[in-house]
Protein backbone atom coordinates (compact mmCIF):
# COMPACT_ATOMS: atom_id res chain seq x y z
CA UNK A 1 0.00 0.00 0.00
CA UNK A 2 2.80 2.40 0.86
CA UNK A 3 4.62 1.66 -2.38
CA UNK A 4 1.47 2.22 -4.45
CA UNK A 5 0.76 5.44 -2.59
CA UNK A 6 4.29 6.77 -3.21
CA UNK A 7 4.03 5.95 -6.90
CA UNK A 8 0.67 7.64 -7.36
CA UNK A 9 1.82 10.66 -5.33
CA UNK A 10 3.72 11.81 -8.43
CA UNK A 11 0.33 12.58 -9.98
CA UNK A 12 -1.23 14.29 -6.98
CA UNK A 13 -1.96 17.93 -7.72
CA UNK A 14 -1.30 17.35 -11.42
CA UNK A 15 -3.79 14.76 -12.74
CA UNK A 16 -7.30 13.83 -11.52
CA UNK A 17 -6.53 10.10 -11.77
CA UNK A 18 -9.31 7.66 -10.95
CA UNK A 19 -8.88 4.31 -9.19
CA UNK A 20 -10.96 1.17 -9.63
CA UNK A 21 -10.35 -1.20 -6.72
CA UNK A 22 -9.39 -4.79 -7.60
CA UNK A 23 -9.53 -8.22 -6.02
CA UNK A 24 -6.15 -7.87 -4.31
CA UNK A 25 -7.24 -4.61 -2.67
CA UNK A 26 -9.63 -6.48 -0.37
CA UNK A 27 -9.14 -9.01 2.41
CA UNK A 28 -5.75 -10.43 3.33
CA UNK A 29 -4.71 -11.54 -0.13
CA UNK A 30 -7.56 -11.84 -2.61
CA UNK A 31 -10.95 -10.64 -1.47
CA UNK A 32 -11.61 -13.00 1.42
CA UNK A 33 -13.72 -10.16 2.81
CA UNK A 34 -14.50 -6.50 2.19
CA UNK A 35 -11.77 -4.98 4.33
CA UNK A 36 -9.54 -2.55 2.46
CA UNK A 37 -7.03 0.23 3.05
CA UNK A 38 -8.13 2.27 0.03
CA UNK A 39 -9.86 4.94 2.19
CA UNK A 40 -6.73 5.20 4.34
CA UNK A 41 -4.19 5.57 1.55
CA UNK A 42 -6.35 7.27 -1.08
CA UNK A 43 -8.69 9.66 0.73
CA UNK A 44 -10.40 12.22 -1.46
CA UNK A 45 -8.45 15.08 0.08
CA UNK A 46 -5.02 13.74 -0.96
CA UNK A 47 -5.28 14.97 -4.55
CA UNK A 48 -6.27 18.61 -5.02
CA UNK A 49 -7.29 17.84 -8.63
CA UNK A 50 -10.32 15.92 -7.34
CA UNK A 51 -11.66 18.98 -5.57
CA UNK A 52 -13.49 20.41 -8.57
CA UNK A 53 -14.50 17.19 -10.36
CA UNK A 54 -15.70 14.79 -7.64
CA UNK A 55 -19.50 14.97 -7.76
CA UNK A 56 -20.83 11.81 -6.07
CA UNK A 57 -19.82 8.84 -3.93
CA UNK A 58 -21.33 5.75 -2.31
CA UNK A 59 -20.16 3.97 0.88
CA UNK A 60 -17.91 0.95 0.52
CA UNK A 61 -18.51 -2.44 2.14
CA UNK A 62 -17.39 -1.08 5.50
CA UNK A 63 -19.59 2.01 5.33
CA UNK A 64 -16.65 4.29 4.51
CA UNK A 65 -16.65 6.94 1.79
CA UNK A 66 -13.77 6.33 -0.61
CA UNK A 67 -12.59 6.17 -4.22
CA UNK A 68 -14.13 2.71 -4.58
CA UNK A 69 -17.55 4.01 -5.60
CA UNK A 70 -17.29 7.54 -6.90
CA UNK A 71 -18.16 9.76 -9.84
CA UNK A 72 -16.15 12.54 -11.49
CA UNK A 73 -17.41 15.21 -13.87
CA UNK A 74 -15.39 16.75 -16.68
CA UNK A 75 -16.21 19.40 -19.29
CA UNK A 76 -14.64 19.75 -22.72
CA UNK A 77 -15.43 22.21 -25.49
CA UNK A 78 -15.49 19.41 -28.07
CA UNK A 79 -16.89 16.53 -26.03
CA UNK A 80 -19.30 18.39 -23.80
CA UNK A 81 -20.11 16.98 -20.36
CA UNK A 82 -18.52 13.69 -19.29
CA UNK A 83 -19.20 11.66 -16.14
CA UNK A 84 -16.82 8.88 -15.07
CA UNK A 85 -18.31 6.40 -12.60
CA UNK A 86 -16.00 3.91 -10.89
CA UNK A 87 -17.15 0.98 -8.76
CA UNK A 88 -15.66 -1.48 -6.29
CA UNK A 89 -14.52 -5.00 -7.20
CA UNK A 90 -17.50 -7.35 -7.76
CA UNK A 91 -19.84 -4.48 -6.84
CA UNK A 92 -22.73 -5.10 -4.49
CA UNK A 93 -26.21 -4.87 -6.02
CA UNK A 94 -26.75 -1.57 -4.17
CA UNK A 95 -23.71 -0.12 -5.94
CA UNK A 96 -25.10 -0.98 -9.37
CA UNK A 97 -28.40 0.63 -8.36
CA UNK A 98 -26.53 3.76 -7.27
CA UNK A 99 -24.51 3.94 -10.50
CA UNK A 100 -27.59 3.43 -12.68
CA UNK A 101 -29.63 6.02 -10.79
CA UNK A 102 -26.77 8.52 -10.91
CA UNK A 103 -26.27 8.15 -14.67
CA UNK A 104 -29.99 8.56 -15.23
CA UNK A 105 -30.51 11.45 -12.84
CA UNK A 106 -31.75 14.80 -14.09
CA UNK A 107 -28.33 16.32 -13.42
CA UNK A 108 -26.32 13.78 -15.44
CA UNK A 109 -28.65 12.19 -17.99
CA UNK A 110 -27.25 14.54 -20.66
CA UNK A 111 -23.65 13.55 -19.89
CA UNK A 112 -21.60 10.98 -21.77
CA UNK A 113 -20.85 8.35 -19.11
CA UNK A 114 -17.73 6.20 -18.85
CA UNK A 115 -18.15 3.22 -16.49
CA UNK A 116 -15.16 1.67 -14.70
CA UNK A 117 -14.96 -1.55 -12.73
CA UNK A 118 -12.30 -4.19 -12.15
CA UNK A 119 -13.80 -7.46 -13.39
CA UNK A 120 -16.15 -7.22 -16.37
CA UNK A 121 -14.82 -8.91 -19.54
CA UNK A 122 -12.83 -12.10 -20.03
CA UNK A 123 -9.56 -11.93 -21.95
CA UNK A 124 -9.55 -12.45 -25.72
CA UNK A 125 -13.16 -13.70 -26.05
CA UNK A 126 -14.61 -10.57 -24.38
CA UNK A 127 -17.32 -12.66 -22.73
CA UNK A 128 -18.84 -11.15 -19.62
CA UNK A 129 -17.40 -12.53 -16.39
CA UNK A 130 -19.65 -14.70 -14.25
CA UNK A 131 -19.80 -14.89 -10.47
CA UNK A 132 -16.29 -15.24 -9.05
CA UNK A 133 -14.90 -17.80 -6.63
CA UNK A 134 -13.83 -15.03 -4.26
CA UNK A 135 -15.42 -15.18 -0.82
CA UNK A 136 -16.31 -11.49 -0.74
CA UNK A 137 -20.07 -11.07 -0.49
CA UNK A 138 -22.50 -9.87 -1.67
CA UNK A 139 -21.14 -9.59 -5.18
CA UNK A 140 -22.26 -9.20 -8.77
CA UNK A 141 -20.67 -10.37 -12.03
CA UNK A 142 -19.63 -8.68 -15.25
CA UNK A 143 -22.87 -9.91 -16.78
CA UNK A 144 -24.77 -8.17 -13.97
CA UNK A 145 -22.76 -4.99 -14.60
CA UNK A 146 -24.00 -5.03 -18.18
CA UNK A 147 -27.58 -6.11 -17.48
CA UNK A 148 -28.28 -3.97 -14.42
CA UNK A 149 -26.30 -0.82 -15.18
CA UNK A 150 -24.55 -0.35 -18.52
CA UNK A 151 -27.11 -1.72 -20.97
CA UNK A 152 -30.06 0.11 -19.39
CA UNK A 153 -28.29 3.46 -19.06
CA UNK A 154 -28.68 5.17 -22.47
CA UNK A 155 -25.84 7.62 -21.83
CA UNK A 156 -23.14 5.07 -20.95
CA UNK A 157 -20.91 5.11 -24.03
CA UNK A 158 -17.83 3.27 -22.77
CA UNK A 159 -17.02 0.66 -20.11
CA UNK A 160 -13.44 -0.21 -19.14
CA UNK A 161 -12.00 -2.90 -16.89
CA UNK A 162 -8.96 -5.07 -16.14
CA UNK A 163 -8.54 -8.23 -14.05
CA UNK A 164 -8.59 -11.18 -16.47
CA UNK A 165 -5.69 -12.62 -18.44
CA UNK A 166 -3.35 -15.58 -18.76
CA UNK A 167 0.25 -16.17 -19.84
CA UNK A 168 0.53 -16.32 -23.60
CA UNK A 169 0.13 -13.90 -26.46
CA UNK A 170 -0.61 -10.23 -25.88
CA UNK A 171 -4.13 -10.96 -27.09
CA UNK A 172 -4.61 -12.92 -23.86
CA UNK A 173 -4.29 -9.66 -21.92
CA UNK A 174 -6.89 -7.61 -23.80
CA UNK A 175 -10.50 -7.74 -24.96
CA UNK A 176 -12.91 -5.48 -26.80
CA UNK A 177 -16.55 -5.66 -27.83
CA UNK A 178 -19.37 -3.37 -28.94
CA UNK A 179 -23.01 -4.03 -28.03
CA UNK A 180 -26.27 -2.15 -28.38
CA UNK A 181 -27.86 -0.81 -25.21
CA UNK A 182 -31.62 -0.76 -24.66
CA UNK A 183 -31.76 2.59 -26.47
CA UNK A 184 -30.16 1.06 -29.57
CA UNK A 185 -26.87 2.92 -29.12
CA UNK A 186 -23.43 1.34 -29.39
CA UNK A 187 -21.54 0.79 -26.14
CA UNK A 188 -17.78 0.24 -26.44
CA UNK A 189 -16.34 -2.14 -23.83
CA UNK A 190 -12.64 -2.71 -23.28
CA UNK A 191 -10.46 -4.86 -20.99
CA UNK A 192 -6.74 -4.22 -20.56
CA UNK A 193 -4.61 -6.20 -18.09
CA UNK A 194 -0.94 -6.65 -18.93
CA UNK A 195 0.36 -7.71 -15.51
CA UNK A 196 1.51 -11.07 -16.92
CA UNK A 197 3.22 -9.63 -20.01
CA UNK A 198 6.99 -9.77 -19.76
CA UNK A 199 7.48 -13.04 -17.92
CA UNK A 200 4.15 -14.35 -16.67
CA UNK A 201 2.71 -14.04 -13.17
CA UNK A 202 6.14 -13.77 -11.53
CA UNK A 203 7.72 -11.77 -14.33
CA UNK A 204 8.28 -8.10 -15.12
CA UNK A 205 4.85 -6.83 -14.12
CA UNK A 206 3.65 -5.91 -17.58
CA UNK A 207 6.68 -4.23 -19.19
CA UNK A 208 5.11 -0.84 -18.53
CA UNK A 209 2.39 -1.17 -21.18
CA UNK A 210 -0.27 1.52 -21.05
CA UNK A 211 -3.57 1.74 -22.91
CA UNK A 212 -3.94 5.34 -24.10
CA UNK A 213 -7.30 6.76 -25.16
CA UNK A 214 -7.09 9.99 -27.16
CA UNK A 215 -10.36 11.90 -27.40
CA UNK A 216 -10.20 13.65 -30.76
CA UNK A 217 -11.40 17.23 -31.46
CA UNK A 218 -14.35 15.99 -33.53
CA UNK A 219 -16.12 15.05 -30.28
CA UNK A 220 -16.94 11.52 -31.40
CA UNK A 221 -13.73 9.63 -32.19
CA UNK A 222 -11.54 7.98 -29.54
CA UNK A 223 -8.17 6.73 -30.79
CA UNK A 224 -6.86 3.75 -28.84
CA UNK A 225 -3.09 3.21 -28.62
CA UNK A 226 -0.80 0.87 -26.67
CA UNK A 227 2.52 2.29 -25.50
CA UNK A 228 5.30 1.36 -23.07
CA UNK A 229 7.31 4.23 -21.54
CA UNK A 230 9.66 1.55 -20.15
CA UNK A 231 10.69 0.69 -23.71
CA UNK A 232 10.26 4.24 -24.97
CA UNK A 233 12.76 5.80 -22.58
CA UNK A 234 15.76 3.90 -23.95
CA UNK A 235 17.26 4.45 -27.43
CA UNK A 236 17.96 0.72 -27.61
CA UNK A 237 14.32 -0.31 -27.08
CA UNK A 238 12.23 2.66 -28.22
CA UNK A 239 11.46 0.89 -31.49
CA UNK A 240 9.46 -1.59 -29.39
CA UNK A 241 7.51 1.05 -27.48
CA UNK A 242 4.42 1.15 -29.71
CA UNK A 243 2.32 -1.94 -30.34
CA UNK A 244 0.57 -1.73 -33.70
CA UNK A 245 -1.51 -4.89 -34.00
CA UNK A 246 -5.25 -4.92 -34.58
CA UNK A 247 -5.92 -5.38 -30.87
CA UNK A 248 -3.45 -2.63 -29.92
CA UNK A 249 -4.56 0.38 -31.91
CA UNK A 250 -8.02 1.13 -33.26
CA UNK A 251 -10.69 3.83 -33.31
CA UNK A 252 -13.92 3.92 -31.34
CA UNK A 253 -16.78 6.01 -32.72
CA UNK A 254 -18.91 7.20 -29.81
CA UNK A 255 -22.65 6.88 -30.43
CA UNK A 256 -24.50 9.51 -28.38
For each predicted feature, which ranges?
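Active-site neighborhood of phospho(di)ester-bond hydrolases with catalytic His/Asp-centered motifs
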Residues: 16-22, 87, 114-118, 137-140, ...
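Binuclear metal-dependent phosphoesterase catalytic core
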Residues: 167-256
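Residue-level recognition of alpha-helix boundary/capping or hinge positions
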Residues: 4-6, 55-62, 76, 109-112, ...
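Solvent-exposed loop/turn segments at secondary-structure junctions
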Residues: 23-28, 88-93, 119-124, 163-168, ...
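Alpha-helical scaffold elements lining the catalytic groove of polysaccharide deacetylases
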Residues: 101-103
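Generic beta-strand hydrophobic packing signal
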Residues: 85, 159, 225-227
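Extended active-site neighborhood of metal-dependent phosphoesterases/phosphodiesterases
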Residues: 1-97, 107-108, 169-191, 211-212, ...
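Active-site-proximal segments of metal-dependent phosphoesterases and phosphodiesterases across multiple
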Residues: 93-97, 106-157, 171
Amino acid sequence: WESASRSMARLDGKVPYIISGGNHDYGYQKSENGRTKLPEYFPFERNSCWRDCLVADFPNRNGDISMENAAFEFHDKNWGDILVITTEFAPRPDVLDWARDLAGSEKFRGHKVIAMTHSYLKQRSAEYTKNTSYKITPQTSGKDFWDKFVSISPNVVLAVCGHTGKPGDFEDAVAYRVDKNTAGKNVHQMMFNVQISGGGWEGNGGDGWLRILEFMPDGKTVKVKTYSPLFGISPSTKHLAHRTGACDQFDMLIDF
